[in-house]
Amino acid sequence: FLPMLAGLAASMVPKLVCLITKKC
């Protein structure tokens, strides 16, 4: 459960940074 959650977070963070900073 925890490794899957960590993997999900790792995939979501770059997308959030991309949207927030507008640097894609």
From Swiss-Prot:
One Pfam family matching this protein: Antimicrobial_1
GO BP terms in the entry: defense response to bacterium
Disulphide bridges: C18-C24
Organ and tissue specificity: Expressed by the skin glands.
Signal peptide range: none
GO CC term, one of those recorded: extracellular region
InterPro entries noted in UniProt: Antimicrobial_frog_1
Subcellular location: Secreted
Keyword line: Amphibian defense peptide, Antibiotic, Antimicrobial, Disulfide bond, Secreted
Job description of the protein: Antibacterial activity against Gram-positive bacterium S.aureus and Gram-negative bacterium E.coli.
Family membership: Belongs to the frog skin active peptide (FSAP) family. Brevinin subfamily.
Official protein name in the record: Brevinin-1La
